[in-house]
Amino acid sequence: MMDSFAQDWPTLTHTDNGLAMDQLSGVVGGGDLPGDVGFEPQTRARSNTWPCPRPENFVEQADELDSTKASNQQLADSQQAIQNANAAKKNSSRRNAWGNLSYADLITHAIGSATDKRLTLSQIYEWMVQNVPYFKDKGDSNSSAGWKNSIRHNLSLHNRFMRVQNEGTGKSSWWMLNPEAKPGKSVRRRAASMETSRYEKRRGRAKKRVEALRQAGVVGLNDATPSPSSSVSEGLDHFPESPLHSGGGFQLSPDFRQRASSNASSCGRLSPIRAQDLEPQDLWGFPVDYQNTTMTQAHAQALEELTGSMADELTLCNQQQQQFSAASGLPSQPPPPPYQPPQLQQQQQQQPSYSLNGPAPGGYQTLQPQSQSQCLLHRSLNCSCLHNARDGLSPNSVTTTMSPAYPNSEPSSDSLNTYSNVVLDGSSDLLVQQQQQQQLQQQQVKVEFEGQCLEVLNNEAQPIDEFNLENFPVGNLECNVEELLQQEMSYDGLLDINIPLANVSTNAPLVSLVNNSTTLSSSSSNLSGSTTTLSSSSLSAAVQLNQLQAQLQQQQQQQQQQQHLQQQQQQHHQHQQQLLLNNNNNNNNNNSSNSSLDLATQTAATNLNAARVQYSQPSVVTSPPSWVH
């Protein structure tokens, strides 16, 4: 048994799919099945859909070719017959079931046949039923819904018909023919978003306006052609209401597209952004390496007009500043320099601010450029500007800085006061000149301090804690607090005065200002507290009123209940009285009946007694009469 397992196993001649392996080996060319012999990769069609593609060497039989040709000929004949039928149908004189006229033509005939040339909707229906044979048997409500709906649609969609309000109340409107309608086939009304004649007129007017601007010699415009879907090209969008339009408008960038540039809208607008972004400039008009090559003289003049009109609307005008300085006892200070257009400031581009280190003779040094990035109140000791100036301070130099807010004013003397112990090299004449200069500068410090205060009060962006009030000479300074508060409260009733108490010195004017501001804030808090109390009192009054109303309602309900109880008691009392009366009547009747019965019994008794007496008497025998025998 084990030897039989050691023998070679017989090879299968068939696979699972029933294909003989010897036949497959004969097709391949050998008894074995090498994996790379006889099987070549075949190309496969990209679309393997039904019906399957025919092989390349397929030959059609003759009968199949004849049948295919016959079927193709029949199909061509049927298509030709259908085309002939369609042509005959198009040439027919009857386009609709009632004739060649459309609904709009029938309505036109109906309105034209009227004496007043106007008909109501019901009259149009009646004319259709009476004059068109097709609608004579379709006048009832069941069969007239379709064609009446078509008439209403044609009346509302065609331009040749217009609706006129009827004079009488509760009557339908009149339908008339529009005399301004175009002859021929009437055009249906479109939606408001589609391009109609009204939008075409607007587009024409806009193009004429652009041509007029071109002929007027407007400079700085792009050469782009107008877009067919927009009223104005991207490079020709101007703003006539702008004050800058008088001398030539801003140039728009060619990379900006329209906000709505589809074909369905012809009123596209452009974003009002300038073509070239301006670099940020200094706060007081110092340009930072910017050169405008497209700015013209007319444009600069327009900018000056704009800044002049804007300067008139500033909160602190020159007159108010003069009043403030007159009330405070300080000398008047000219306002900051006006804004100059960039073209006129090109000469000042390369002019940085300077720290004045005295002149060359007598030990003074030459002018040295100083950094432009200084804070608005750079005179305080906490400012980085003076720290930078201290590092470069030498015994032969006296550092004085110029305020960026007042470039034309004299240099300030804060550093001179701070560093008064600097030893100066030179003769006594230079010392005298220096003392005189210090006196002049000390007089001008007050004026500059007033301007600085005004700038800080009106500029919320600059924090007020940059002040170092201890370093300012406040010997002769005065402040009219009432006028200042009126000035602040005049701006839409907003009062915002924030002065930290830690930085305020013990000087009387500043302390009085702080006291007044704190008093005002306390009064405002008292006012808010009073308003809160008033609101709470109003709420309590409302609650009390609601309670009183509830009590009144309860009292009314109690009164109604009491009245109802009283009515019930009265009814019950009346009922009892009625019962008593009925009982008395019954008693009287009983008494009368009893008395009559007693009388009857008494009479009967007397009669009986009388009878007894009669029967109790002895009988008397009488003799018969004489004639009785």
UniProtKB/Swiss-Prot annotation:
Q: What organism is the protein native to?
A: Drosophila persimilis (Fruit fly)
- Reported function: Transcription factor involved in the regulation of the insulin signaling pathway. Consistently activates both the downstream target Thor\d4EBP and the feedback control target InR. Involved in negative regulation of the cell cycle, modulating cell growth and proliferation. In response to cellular stresses, such as nutrient deprivation or increased levels of reactive oxygen species, foxo is activated and inhibits growth through the action of target genes such as Thor.
For the modification Phosphoserine, which residues carry it? S78, S193, S262, S265, S266, S271
The listed locations are:
Cytoplasm; Nucleus
Key word Transcription present in the record?
Answer: yes
| Entry GO terms, CC | cytoplasm; nucleus
Record has DNA-binding as a keyword: yes
Keywords noted in UniProt? Activator, Cell cycle, Cytoplasm, Developmental protein, Differentiation, DNA-binding, Growth regulation, Nucleus, Phosphoprotein, Transcription, Transcription regulation
Q: What is this protein called?
A: Forkhead box protein O
Show the ranges annotated as biased composition (Polar residues): 224-233, 259-268, 394-403
Bias (Pro residues) ranges = 332-341
According to the UniProt record, which residues make up the DNA-binding region? 98-204
User: Residue ranges under compositional bias (Low complexity)?
Assistant: 342-356
GO molecular function: any one? DNA-binding transcription factor activity, RNA polymerase II-specific
